Structure formats: structure tokens, C-alpha cells
Amino acid sequence: MIDSEALENERTKLKREIAELRAALNRKEQCLRDLETTISEATGDEDDVHPDTNGGVCHTQLSNDDIARYSRQLILPDFGVQGQLRLKNSSVLIVGMGGLGCPAAQYLAAAGCGKLGLIDYDEVERSNFHRQILHSEARCGMSKAESARIALLELNQHCEIRCHTRLLNSRNAMHIIRTYDVVLDCSDNVATRYLLNDACVMLRKPLVSGSALKTDGQLTVYCYGNGPCYRCIYPVPPPPEAVTNCGDGGVLGAVTGTIGAMQALEAIKVIVGLGDVLAGRLLIFDGSSCLFRNIRIRSKRPNCHVCSAQPLITELIDYELFCGMHATDKDNPLQLLASEERLDVEEYRNKVQQQPHLLIDVRQPAEFEICQLPDAVNVPLAEVLDDSYLKRFSKQLEDTQLPIILLCRRGNDSQIAVQHVRNRFPKHSIRDIIGGLHAWTHKVDPSFPIY
């Protein structure tokens, strides 16, 4: 008789052992990458790359395999053999192997782009999988660039893939970008957008820029023909508190897939000379209604600091300093309050939580539904700022001795809320929790969900 319980236990054991082996392999591979980076830095090489497999050869004809593989686009009248050869001899740099970069790279590799450069300093984690479609659970913890390379070579082994596993910055950007024909901005932060724009203007490289947030996406091509650059449209960066990335605002995976695929399309059009490139225009996608709009954007700014006839910026600058933001999409803590106006999460647990107080969670209702602290009441930040919460807590707010604690996901929105509430109730003790719910998980309760 089959012992089903024993078989199930054996299966569970094997799955656990396989997961442990994969994790060990990922750690070893990361150690190797770190060692190669150290060697690269010691020898003055700014790249983490794989050897050039085509030796810089200019292909003048297609192989039988090329013809069979790419036949459906070869028969397009405006594409043909010459279009495929241009793709085969082209190189595209994709900055960010996330929700935009993954589908863009997938379609470029599938279309027969000769060389792809993949830039990403980050590692694969579980929160990536719903939109970053080249990565897999088996490669959790692996460099995103390396993970994408594995998937792309399974799709098309003839595509040369170069991995740059370090953070793009002012010191290495020019060296890396100059070896590619087209650049795709698939990043999720303002500092990198300015860095890429300035480098592409200086090196005269077309820049295909995409973005996606919630159910919306945008796409345009900068530094192409007589079209404007990013600085022409945004000469001054926005304040840090006005910037929302997908880690804070959320995004539907299919929206990033839509924009990423269209970034690949624009890159192909630039390389092949196909159709009307999206320069001087902005494509806006509303995923909630599936509507596309195509609008004209301003022309080149005559006094642009980078792309004008007499530019003020002729070399790359410190973009994190210029933007007041980190060049990553990781937690970027704001510093809007003095230290005495803030509360450490452990101090809250040990002292304040045991006493009467009003704990206001300023996240959106959808986020509050995911997880919340005991006794927290949900008042979204927008309601705090427009004072619509006042009637709800009129009795509590009459007691000036009752501490008011503001809480959010990471400790950023709560600072904005504190500033506003303090102006309305200057006699109250009003503070926020440093690091928000992320800090609660990391320092107090590891079982508390993190997202």
C-alpha cells in the first residue's frame, strides 16, 4: 500500500533541498561577480562584460537560420533583408532590467538585435515577478542583468549579451554608453533620467524613454533628429516629495509590458529607419480605459543647458546632488522633520503603544487592507491634507494631552502629514514613526507582512 504521507514528506524534503542548492549556487555566482568586479576595478576596466563574440564584424548577409527565424518580419515591404541586417549589426543599451527593461530586451533579442547591453545593479526578488518577466523564482537573489541574460540566450543564442552589474553613474556612463547605437531608459528614478539624457546628448545617441505607474504609461524618444532632449522638457527636477515610483504608487504588470514592448518598437524603428519615430511627441497610455493619446511636446529649447548651440553643461555632473534624490528605486527616506519630531519604531512599541494615543495610518485604503497595526485608524494622506478627517476625530483632538502618531509604509508620507497636522494643532504632541511599517517588520515583528 502506498504511504501518501511519506511520499509527500519526501517531496517536501526534495523541494527544500533543491531550493537550498539554488540559493547556494546564486551565492557562489554573486561571489564570482563581486570578485570579477574587484579585478575589473583594480585593472581600471569600468565594465563588467562578457567577451565580444562577433569581433566587431559587420554582417553583409543573412544566414539560412536568420531567414527562417526572422521570416515574418523579413517579408514586410518596409523592413526586408536590409532592415534585418541593420538590426543584426546594431547594439542597444537597456538601462534597468525591471518591468520596462525585461519586455524591451525580450523583443529586441527576439527581433535579432546583434548586441544588447543590460545595466542593473540590483538583484532579483519576489516582488519583481509580477512584471519583470525575464526573471524566475529559481534565480531569486541573482543579479538582474545576469538573470535576464540567461533568459535572453534561451530565446536567441545568436544575440550577444553584455552585462553591466554596477550602478550607472557620472564616472562610468560615458564609457559604457559610447559603445552602443541606441539607449533605452527603463529606469525608475529622476537622477538616472537626467544622467542618461546628458550623456546621450553629448554622445549623440538616441534615447528611448519609457515610464509606467499604476495603470498609466508614457513613451517618447529624446535626442533624435531635431527633437528635444529631456532637459528641454524638464529643465528643473521636481522636488523629491513630489516623485512617486512604482514601489510607492504601484503598477500593473501588463502596463509595464505594454510600454516596454513599445520601447523595443521605437528602438527598432530608429535602427532600421522604419516609420515615424516618436521624437517631439509623447505617447500616453491609459490602461484603465485602454486609450492611447499622442501629443506634441515642445521643440528644442534654444537655451537648453545641454543640447543648445552653446551648452552650459559640457560634462556629466553629480545627478543625485542635482536632483536631491538617490539614483535608485530603493527606499529613499525623506528628511522633512527634526529628530525630536520623529519616533523610533522600538520607542513606539516600548513606550507610546502602551499609553493612550491616536495612531493615524496615512496609506491608501487598498494598502491598509493588506496589513495594519493594532488600533491604527486609516486616514489617507489626501484626507489629512484637506482636513476632511477633523470631524471624525473631533473628541480626540480636543484633548491636547493625547499624543498623535502618524504612520505610513516607509516613513515619508507620514512626515508630510505631521507638518500639516502640527500647523492645525500646535499644542498637541505630533510625531511620525521613522521608517514606517518597513521598520516595524525589520526591527519589531519579522512576521508582519512587507510589500
UniProtKB/Swiss-Prot annotation:
It is found in: Cytoplasm, Cytosol. The modification Phosphothreonine is found at T60. SMART domains: RHOD. Its EC number is 2.7.7.80, 2.8.1.11. Pfam families: Rhodanese, ThiF. Binds 1 zinc ion per subunit. ATP binds at G99, D120, S127, N128, F129, H130, R131, K144, D188, N189. Zn(2+) binds at C229, C232, C304, C307. Its cofactor is Zn(2+). Residues 353-449 form the Rhodanese domain. One of its GO terms (cellular component) is cytosol. It is an enzyme of class 2 (transferase). Keywords: ATP-binding, Cytoplasm, Metal-binding, Molybdenum cofactor biosynthesis, Multifunctional enzyme, Nucleotide-binding, Nucleotidyltransferase, Phosphoprotein, Transferase, tRNA processing, Zinc. Its main location: cytoplasm. PROSITE patterns: RHODANESE_3. PANTHER family: ADENYLYLTRANSFERASE AND SULFURTRANSFERASE MOCS3 (PTHR10953:SF102), UBIQUITIN-ACTIVATING ENZYME E1 (PTHR10953). HAMAP family: MOCS3_Uba4 (MF_03049). In the N-terminal section; belongs to the HesA/MoeB/ThiF family. UBA4 subfamily. Plays a central role in 2-thiolation of mcm(5)S(2)U at tRNA wobble positions of cytosolic tRNA(Lys), tRNA(Glu) and tRNA(Gln). Also essential during biosynthesis of the molybdenum cofactor. Acts by mediating the C-terminal thiocarboxylation of sulfur carriers URM1 and MOCS2A. Its N-terminus first activates URM1 and MOCS2A as acyl-adenylates (-COAMP), then the persulfide sulfur on the catalytic cysteine is transferred to URM1 and MOCS2A to form thiocarboxylation (-COSH) of their C-terminus. This is Adenylyltransferase and sulfurtransferase MOCS3. It comes from Drosophila ananassae (Fruit fly).
